[in-house]
Amino acid sequence: MKYILSIDQGTTSSRAIVFDKHANIKGLAQKEFTQIYPQPSWVEHDPTEIWGSQLGVITEALANSRILPNEVDAIGITNQRETTVIWEKSTGKPIYNAIVWQDRRTAKICDQLTKEGKDKIILEKTGLVLDSYFSGTKILWILDNVEGARQKAENGELCFGTIDTWLLWNLTQKKVHATDYSNASRTLLLNIKTLEWDDELLKILNIPKAILPELKESSTIYGETDKSIFGAEIPIAGIAGDQFAATFGQACLKKGMAKNTYGTGCFLTVNIGKEPIINHERLLTSIAWGRKKTVTYVLEGSVFIGGAVIQWLRDGLEFFRKSSDAESLASSASDNGGVYFVPAFVGLGAPHWDSYARGTIIGITRGSTKAHITRAALESIAFQSFDILNTMKKSIPNFEIKELRVDGGASQNNLLMQFQADLLECKVVRPKITETTALGAAYLAGLASGYWQSAEEIISLWQVDKIFEPSMPKNQKEKLLENWNRAIERSKSWIQNSNSL
């Protein structure tokens, strides 16, 4: 019997999951790693710690599954996107910490480029808004702020990669420096129409082409693990950024299908087929995956703070000991008591894109309790997702959402899922296997290795766990949305001095 090993390198933890042919989980392991906050709005990770934690959980997951490395048919990698690592080619040593997707330090660089009109060129070529969220300005910052980095980059002595590339480099012991189209489409450097690194974009961001990885399809053989690591050479056969892997794992393989992942942030994607739609409503067009010599595009809205707001209530305010306790606490209040929570801790993502917004809890009275604030925090996740889907409806011709497939840790929260169905006025469907990000990476790897034969086989493996039907009266929903919109306007442009970022 053979299995697929999925590497799921996330924002707060490294995970590894072993799947069998029926997409059942045979074993898994997870390890949290250090979040580094050198200054307000700066977020970093130690790339060496990421690699070490990932290696540890792979070994543990295989042990938990009671399988040997030579029983693994192929490895799939999925990863937090945009997070940027630059390392020395000769030593493999990072020259700076990984700058995380949440990091806002390059907001001023983006402002300056926007003043110069570069945002329009970037949008047309990449499908992305010009924002510090993406890798491009993070690379620029490292090259300009680490001593000697720019000269080394010009000399071809450095490698850039998103986390998938960093893991691939280490798994193959420096043999493979590559990425897939989905991760590349989040760098501000890939032309999503030509599927090539774009010279004009590289010039705008002053980034030498020599540091960039090779571009490959998401479902293809990248190379093999070095024998020194697991004692076996295992094919690495699938790579996709986390939200794109989740879209694949949710079997949203047909045009018009939508999924929302409720993780650290929220990420709502709609499959828009084989042709990109460049969106002018501040949503993102990206490549979801490339396979069989074609690419599939998605329209995406990204919420920076989703489930992380519950982590903050747990760790920052100590409202409860476990994140899973949030639902029972929130349910102890019949409604939000007039409290609205805009968790703009690092600014606002789609469709607002305001780096200068900050968190707001509004509507508090003497009668407000921990339960009201927790409920408002949970509701904020659904409100932000509603804002995105509402914008998508305006952006995609004849788009009508019939169901939203959901996954991620917070999708286990029934209160949140019901509230989401009520706001969207559509079915919210949770699958039996909610590890859809890891599963998507496994599917991409297994299709490339021949473990699974076709997309139809993947679709047949998807199964429903629970369906949430909308039940809220329309006038109640409209009042909630009206107050949410008032709250979100209060949070915008809070920081007036950009040096405070």
UniProtKB/Swiss-Prot annotation:
GO cellular component: cytosol
Activity regulation description: Inhibited by fructose 1,6-bisphosphate (FBP).
Keywords: ATP-binding, Glycerol metabolism, Kinase, Nucleotide-binding, Transferase
Enzymatic reactions: glycerol + ATP = sn-glycerol 3-phosphate + ADP + H(+)
Binding residue positions for ADP: 11, 15, 264, 307, 409, 413
Enzyme Commission numbers on file: 2.7.1.30
Keyword Mitochondrion: no
InterPro entries, per database record: ATPase_NBD, Carb_kinase_FGGY, Carb_kinase_FGGY_CS, FGGY_C, FGGY_N, Glycerol_kin
Binding site for sn-glycerol 3-phosphate: 11, 81-82, 133, 242
One GO molecular-function entry: glycerol kinase activity
Pathway in which this enzyme or protein is active: Polyol metabolism; glycerol degradation via glycerol kinase pathway; sn-glycerol 3-phosphate from glycerol: step 1/1
GO BP annotations listed: glycerol catabolic process; glycerol metabolic process; glycerol-3-phosphate metabolic process
Binding locations of ATP: 11-13, 264, 307, 311, 409
Positions bound to glycerol: 81-82, 133, 242-243
Record function comment: Key enzyme in the regulation of glycerol uptake and metabolism. Catalyzes the phosphorylation of glycerol to yield sn-glycerol 3-phosphate.
Family: Belongs to the FGGY kinase family.
Protein name, UniProt field: Glycerol kinase
